[in-house]
């Protein structure tokens, strides 16, 4: 379960916040609200039910708080009571965040009002409490009781962050020129107050530089496995060691936000213009536009050609066995489950250098020992041994009872004097695609080889990202790189939520920082790259083109595994479709209807028999071209369906019948059959076809 977080923003809405200072084009309030809106967008995108927000403004024209009976709390308004961040409500509140007509209102009193809101909402429950103050610190501030207030904040674990417009900050060498004496004194006292409650005090300029930085969601560590780590024969206690360990995710792919289908009508377009105070009504209205998906299962009767609906519970799993569907019930699938025991079991060890780099195909997980002395001692000794011997461990891992075993490589990892193992899943034999690629031609000229080696060596040295000439700031490190797609989409969602008709701004500098190599380094490599390009000119060979898959078979040219698989399984995807089943081979379109009949379950025998009759009829009707096309299709599918003997017998009978008629054109047809490669299927052609399947 994620931590419950309560955040209260304290905003300075004084009259002075409406002016621009030091050449800025935005007023002080607009400037500080840019951070406020950026923080809210993070909360909307996170969409956590345990994350609540409150907004308190001071130096307001009116007073709206529970402590307003005392004069010290006048001109302070609770603009948004602590609750879940609702976009429509916060959008209406944001429209009221404008400079007031007064300078009355105390900052310390506003902090007290915010603390009172937190205390009543969070009570004594475990919350992560944050109070963010955005102010220019102009005017008079009452610091008479700040020590007692700081003690209360510390006692209730409230984090206080004060980010001030044009605050002086020594550690970044920033100071505002011609600062007013009152503002300067306020900054000093505010810094003392913040430091006394262990908060954060900094100038808003530093905060503003981080606005738009991709937000990385923090995830609480949750163990995905707890069990035994066995070294040796686990069945024998005398010859094995069992360590209690826990497994945690280390790296996981962050996916972009997913979209949902909604129906946009006139009411949903005008909805955001309404000011609805009841959140239940709001949620119900938004959910009414969501599109729900209903799935139905239809079965077609091949005899009557009618369809009828069946329930999901009445369906069974089926697997294709050639063109036959083999059903396996759920009870049978349970019987097929492996009788395995959860845990890690060490199989052996390999040198680090023997692991192919492309074998790491999975996410990474980290293994830590349980919090007892014996487990930590044994585990630490095992990790240190791997590190000293420069080896990895191979382990068999099962995550649950009767689970599927996987093969892992365990890598030693030491961080902050703590010992861990990082596990990465290895592929099985069927998971590897052992493609072989043609070699590049070697240069016969030794002088050319020497020049290329020298140029490549210079290029590598000049493109060193750790050098002082590198233009990346900050340096190129994994923690400074961000995935473009999810963060760019989040930026678009946040922008269009506030400005539906606006133009999406350019991607943030944090996303585009490492999209191109540093120009300063590339300029040093121009001559080397030019030499490499001249010496290593690669001519791409022209790929042969085939008009059809039959041509590829007839010419002996290889076709891809995907093309063969498509031919073999071309009918499976349409068995449950809306297309009507074709039950007979027609003389108008013999090739097309023959292919469709083959898609039917148990349609092979009918398709071959009818195609043989159609070819004979076409010859009798002197439609020789169509007969040759049909014979070519029959020959190809006879190879694919292992009906070679039947085709050869049929072709022998067909030739004999044609020659008995003794017609000149039919005799010419026999010659065309031979010249077109449609004669009897020989053994070497079958061997060539088998080689295609093994590609």
Curated annotation (Swiss-Prot):
Keywords: ATP-binding, Chromosome, DNA damage, DNA recombination, DNA repair, DNA-binding, Helicase, Hydrolase, Nucleotide-binding, Nucleus, Telomere. This is ATP-dependent DNA helicase II subunit 2. GO terms for molecular function: 3'-5' DNA helicase activity; ATP binding; ATP hydrolysis activity; damaged DNA binding; telomeric DNA binding. Single-stranded DNA-dependent ATP-dependent helicase. Involved in non-homologous end joining (NHEJ) DNA double strand break repair. DNA-binding is sequence-independent but has a high affinity to nicks in double-stranded DNA and to the ends of duplex DNA. Binds to naturally occurring chromosomal ends, and therefore provides chromosomal end protection. Required also for telomere recombination to repair telomeric ends in the absence of telomerase. ku70, of the ku70/ku80 heterodimer, binds to the stem loop of tlc1, the RNA component of telomerase. Involved in telomere maintenance. It is found in: Nucleus; Chromosome, Telomere. InterPro entries: Ku70/Ku80_beta-barrel_dom (IPR006164), Ku80 (IPR024193), Ku_C_sf (IPR036494), Ku_PK_bind (IPR014893), SPOC-like_C_dom_sf (IPR016194), vWFA_dom_sf (IPR036465). Coiled coil: none annotated. Its EC number is 3.6.4.12. Disruption phenotype: Spores sensitive to ionizing radiation. Residues 229-461 form the Ku domain. The keyword 4Fe-4S does not apply. It catalyses: ATP + H2O = ADP + phosphate + H(+). It comes from the Eukaryota. Belongs to the ku80 family. It comes from Schizosaccharomyces pombe (strain 972 / ATCC 24843). CDD domains: KU80 (cd00873), vWA_ku (cd01458). Heterodimer of pku70 and pku80.
């Amino acid at each position: 379960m994620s931590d419950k977080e309560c955040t209260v923003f304290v905003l300075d809405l004084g009259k002075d916040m409406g002016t621009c200072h030091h050449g800025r084009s935005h007023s002080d309030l607009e400037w500080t609200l840019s951070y406020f809106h950026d923080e809210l967008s993070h909360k909307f995108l996170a969409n956590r039910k345990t994350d609540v927000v409150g907004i308190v403004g001071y130096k307001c024209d009116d007073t709206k708080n529970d402590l307003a009976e005392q004069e010290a709390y006048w001109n302070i308004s609770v603009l948004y009571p602590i609750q879940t961040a609702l976009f429509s409500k916060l959008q209406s509140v944001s429209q009221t965040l404008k400079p007031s007509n007064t300078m009355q209102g105390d900052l310390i009193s506003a902090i007290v009002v915010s603390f009172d809101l937190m205390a009543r909402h969070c009570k004594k429950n475990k919350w992560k409490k944050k109070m963010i103050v955005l102010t220019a610190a102009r005017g008079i501030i009452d610091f008479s009781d700040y020590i007692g207030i700081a003690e209360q904040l510390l006692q209730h674990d409230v984090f206080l962050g004060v980010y001030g417009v044009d605050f002086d900050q020594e550690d970044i060498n920033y100071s505002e020129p011609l600062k007013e004496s009152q503002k300067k004194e306020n900054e000093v006292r505010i810094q003392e107050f913040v430091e006394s409650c262990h908060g954060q005090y900094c100038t808003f300029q530093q905060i503003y530089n981080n606005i738009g930085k991709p937000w990385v969601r923090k995830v609480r560590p949750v163990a995905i496995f707890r069990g035994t780590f066995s070294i040796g024969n686990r069945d024998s206690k005398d010859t094995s060691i069992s360590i209690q360990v826990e497994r945690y995710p280390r790296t996981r792919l962050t996916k972009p936000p997913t979209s949902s289908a909604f129906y946009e009508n006139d009411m949903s377009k005008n909805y955001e213009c309404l000011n609805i105070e009841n959140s239940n009504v709001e949620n119900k209205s938004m959910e009414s536009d969501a599109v729900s998906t209903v799935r139905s299962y239809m079965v077609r009767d091949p005899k009557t050609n009618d369809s009828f609906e069946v329930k999901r519970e009445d369906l069974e799993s089926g697997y294709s066995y050639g063109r036959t569907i083999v059903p396996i019930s759920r009870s049978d699938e349970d019987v097929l489950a492996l009788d395995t025991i959860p845990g890690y079991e060490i199989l052996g060890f390999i040198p680090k250098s023997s692991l192919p780099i492309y074998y790491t195909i999975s996410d990474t997980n980290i293994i830590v020992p349980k919090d007892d002395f014996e487990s930590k001692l044994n585990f630490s000794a095992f990790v240190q041994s791997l590190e000293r011997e420069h080896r990895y461990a191979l382990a068999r891992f099962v995550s649950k009872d009767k689970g599927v075993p996987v093969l892992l490589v365990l890598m030693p990892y030491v961080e902050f004097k703590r010992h861990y193992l990082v596990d990465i899943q290895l592929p099985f034999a069927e998971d590897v695609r052992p493609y072989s690629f043609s070699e590049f031609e070697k240069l016969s000229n030794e002088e050319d080889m020497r020049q290329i080696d020298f140029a490549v060596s210079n290029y590598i040295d000049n493109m060193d990202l750790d050098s002082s000439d590198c233009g990346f700031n900050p340096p190129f490190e994994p923690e400074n790189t961000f995935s473009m797609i999810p963060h760019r989409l989040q930026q678009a969602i946040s922008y269009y939520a506030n400005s539906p008709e606006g133009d999406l701004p350019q991607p943030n500098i944090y996303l585009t920082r490492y999209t191109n190599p540093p120009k300063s380094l590339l300029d040093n490599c121009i001559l080397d790259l030019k030499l490499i390009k001249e010496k290593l000119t690669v001519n791409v060979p022209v790929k042969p083109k085939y008009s059809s898959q039959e041509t590829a078979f007839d010419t002996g040219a290889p076709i891809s595994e995907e093309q063969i698989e498509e031919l073999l399984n071309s009918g499976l995807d349409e068995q449950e479709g809306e297309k009507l089943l074709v039950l007979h081979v027609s003389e108008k379109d013999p090739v097309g209807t023959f292919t469709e009949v083959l898609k039917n379950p148990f349609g092979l025998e009918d398709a071959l028999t009818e195609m043989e009759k159609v070819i004979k009829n076409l010859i009798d009707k002197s439609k020789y071209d169509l007969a040759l096309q049909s014979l070519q299709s029959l020959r190809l599918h006879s190879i694919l369906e292992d009906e070679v003997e039947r085709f050869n017998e049929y072709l022998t009978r067909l030739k004999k019948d044609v020659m008995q008629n003794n017609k000149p054109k039919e005799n010419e047809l026999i010659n065309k059959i031979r010249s077109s490669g449609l004669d009897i299927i020989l053994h070497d052609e079958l061997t060539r076809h088998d080689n295609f399947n093994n590609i």
